[in-house]
Amino acid sequence: MKVRVQFFSRLRDLAGTSEMDLEVPERKTAADLLEMVYAKTPALREWDKSILIASSLDFVERTYVLKPGDEISLMPPVQGG
């Protein structure tokens, strides 16, 4: 199934793109998707512990089971004040 991954902020800079489409086997999780992303863009792996994941407008856990046509957003932690 096709899943679109969108990168924000520093992760977009490291990935060298704002988004990528990946073909993902059914019943895979957000954690599985991250491994696929890291295989294509190894520089993102160093951010693994702090990456926030969202599906559409909702933050999701790494155990989230992907659905066909999902748009997954990857972003670094939000900072500011």
What annotation goes with each model-predicted range?
Residues M1-G80:
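Ubiquitin-like/PB1-type beta-grasp interaction modules and other compact soluble beta-rich domains
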